[in-house]
A protein has these predicted regions:
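Bacterial N-terminal signal peptides that target proteins for export
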Residues: 1-8
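Bacterial N-terminal signal peptides
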Residues: 8-17
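Charged, glycine-interspersed solvent-exposed loop segments at helix/strand-loop junctions
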Residues: 159-281
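Terminal-region recognition feature
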Residues: 19-130, 134-137, 141-143, 147-150, ...
Length: 374
C-alpha cells in the first residue's frame, strides 16, 4: 500500500512539474514554440490620459501597427486605461467634463480592424487597467481579457445623452442604432448582446445562470446570480466580479503577473525595457497633440482679440491659421475643439475665408467673435 501511495505521489509530482514547464498554448502557436516570446505593449490611454476620440483613435495606431510589423513580436498586450473623465471611483464621483470621450464608431471600427485583423497573425490579449464608457466596448472586442485588481469595467451610460429627442419614435430608432453598433464590438470578443444592452441602457436588467460549466446571460432578474437589478443605472463591473462571471480571464497587477497567468515561464521583454514598443509611440503622441491643443486655444484667443481691430486683420488671420494647422496635423485637436466649443475644421476654414474677404474689401471689426462654451 505504501509503495502504491509513493508511486502515485511520484507520478503526481512529475505531472505537476511537466505542467509547470509546459509552454503556454499561446506560445505553441508561435512560429518557433521553443523560443521565449518577444512581447510588445500597446497602450490605449497612458498615465491618466485615455480620452476616446483623441488619445485613442485610428491615426496613432496606424503608426503603431507599422512599428509592430517591423519589430515582429510574438505577443501583443493591449493595455487599456480610459476613465472617460471619471476621476472618482464611485459612479457619481467627480467628473472632468473636458476628458469625456465621444466615440466615432467608424474610426473605432477601423482601429479595431487594423489591430485585430492586420496584426491577427500575432497572439493578442487585452489588459484593462481602467475602462469607463465607450472604451469598454473596445476592450470587449478582444476575447482574451485580463484586468488589474483595482480596474473598472464600467458601462456606457452616456449613450443615452446622444439619443435625446422630443419624439419618442426618433429616440427609439437612435437608441437601436447606437446600441446595435456598440454591441458589434462585443460580438467580436464573443460576448452576448444581453451584456452590452445592460451596460448601455439603464432600464435593462441582467442576471446569469449556469448550464453545467457554461454561463448563460439573461436580460431579466430571474437568473441564479443577479448582476444588475437597478433600472436607473447601467451594469458596471469591478475586477473581482468580472473574473467571477468570466468576463475577464484573470487578475494581474503587472506584466509579469499577466505572463504567468497566460502560462509563460520565460519571455523576452527587451522591447519594453528599451522603450521600443508602443508605449513610447503612444506616449509621445498624447504629449504632442495635447501641447498642440493648448497652443491652439491661445491662438484662438489671439484671433478673437485681433479680429475686432481692422488694423490687425493679418494678425488675426495668422492666429487662426495656427488653429487650422493644429487641427490638420492632429485630428484629436479638432475632436477636442468640437467637443468643448463646437469648432470644427470646416468652421475655421470658413472664418479664414471671411477674414480674407474683409481684408479685400477693407472692412473690419466685429470679427469672428467668441464661441460659446459647452
Amino acid at each position: 500500500m505504501k509503495r502504491t501511495s509513493l508511486l502515485v505521489g511520484m507520478l503526481l509530482a512529475a505531472t505537476l512539474a511537466f505542467a509547470a514547464d509546459a509552454p503556454s498554448p499561446l506560445q505553441m502557436n508561435q512560429k518557433d514554440p521553443s523560443k521565449a516570446p518577444k512581447i510588445y505593449v500597446i497602450p490605449m490611454g497612458l498615465d491618466g490620459n485615455g480620452q476616446i476620440g483623441s488619445d485613442i483613435r485610428l491615426s496613432i495606431y496606424e503608426k503603431v501597427a507599422k512599428d509592430v510589423k517591423e519589430k515582429k513580436p510574438d505577443l501583443i498586450i493591449f493595455q487599456m486605461e480610459s476613465a472617460d473623465g471619471k476621476t472618482g471611483k464611485t459612479y457619481l464621483g467627480n467628473d472632468d467634463r473636458s476628458e469625456k470621450g465621444r466615440i466615432d464608431f467608424e474610426d473605432a471600427r477601423k482601429m479595431v480592424d487594423l489591430l485585430k485583423l492586420d496584426l491577427g497573425d500575432i497572439a493578442q490579449v487585452m489588459w484593462v487597467k481602467d475602462s469607463v464608457g465607450f472604451s469598454t466596448a473596445i476592450a470587449l472586442a478582444w476575447p482574451d481579457l485580463y484586468m488589474t485588481s483595482n480596474a473598472r469595467l464600467w458601462g456606457m451610460s452616456r449613450v443615452m445623452e446622444f439619443v435625446r429627442h422630443p419624439d419618442p419614435e426618433v429616440v427609439r430608432k437612435f437608441l437601436a442604432a447606437w446600441t446595435g453598433i456598440a454591441n458589434g464590438f462585443l460580438r467580436r470578443g464573443g460576448y452576448p448582446p444581453e451584456l452590452g444592452l445592460a451596460m448601455m441602457r439603464p432600464e435593462k436588467t441582467l442576471s446569469v445562470s449556469w448550464n453545467g460549466r457554461n454561463l448563460v446571460w439573461r436580460d431579466d432578474t430571474k437568473g441564479t446570480f443577479l448582476v444588475d437589478g437597478d433600472e436607473l443605472t447601467v451594469a458596471n463591473f469591478d475586477a473581482k466580479t468580472a473574473e467571477d462571471l468570466g468576463l475577464c480571464d484573470g487578475i494581474a497587477d503587472s506584466v509579469e503577473d499577466l505572463m504567468f497567468l497566460l502560462g509563460y515561464r520565460e519571455w523576452d521583454d527587451s522591447l519594453c525595457k528599451n522603450n521600443q514598443d508602443g508605449t513610447k509611440i503612444v506616449g509621445d503622441y498624447i504629449l504632442d497633440w495635447r501641447k498642440a491643443f493648448a497652443k491652439s486655444t491661445e491662438s484662438f484667443a489671439e484671433y478673437e482679440k485681433f479680429s475686432a481691430d481692422p488694423k490687425k486683420m493679418n494678425s488675426a488671420k495668422q492666429a487662426l491659421e495656427r488653429v487650422r494647422d493644429a487641427m490638420k496635423k492632429y485630428p484629436a485637436v479638432e475632436f477636442r475643439w468640437k467637443s468643448e466649443r463646437g469648432l470644427s475644421l470646416d468652421v475655421v476654414e470658413k472664418l479664414l475665408l471671411e477674414l480674407k474677404e474683409k481684408s479685400k474689401s477693407g472692412s473690419g471689426g466685429g470679427g469672428g467673435g467668441g464661441l460659446g462654451g459647452r
